[in-house]
């Protein structure tokens, strides 16, 4: 009996160390239900505004985002309605049409946008994050309504922090789904404020 007890006491610290290494992600029934609804969204259209602040530049742009599994189109315009950037993303890569009718392609959409505009925007991850899905996140937290409050992700050795400050109820398949209306992305001294004024889901 003594040997058996001693054996389990020896294993206990190892078990506790193993447990502390597991990611502490929320797993409430309400969150799982909400996450399942979000995962059913195959296509969306989002219209809104983006504010970009960094030591090098400040930009205020309108955006129109049409996303589907096969193709995602993100267009930025100025307040005068002029197209600043027209980005198309597919599984094969990214393509940009500039205001002077140039067409540039690259395998990485984020790098292409930065190359052309100087703006650091994780556009490839945003298709999930903008609807409130923490896919690929290193960590995330929920609010009292069991929707995303924040998430964190390391991209190219840089830590991104995304905070969700406001949600809006949107109709989807004869039910109501809360989707982000305001969120902010921060990476060191870079900050993006995104306001979604209109959602259309399919």
Swiss-Prot record:
Belongs to the LolB family. The keyword Magnesium does not apply. Residues 1-18 form the signal peptide. The lineage of its organism: Bacteria, Pseudomonadati, Pseudomonadota, Gammaproteobacteria, Vibrionales. Keywords: Cell outer membrane, Chaperone, Lipoprotein, Membrane, Palmitate, Protein transport, Signal, Transport. This is Outer-membrane lipoprotein LolB. Monomer. It holds the Pfam family LolB. The gene is lolB. InterPro entries: LolA/LolB/LppX, OM_lipoprot_LolB. It is a lipid-anchor. CDD domains: LolB. One of its GO terms (biological process) is lipoprotein localization to outer membrane. It comes from the Bacteria. GO terms for cellular component: cell outer membrane.
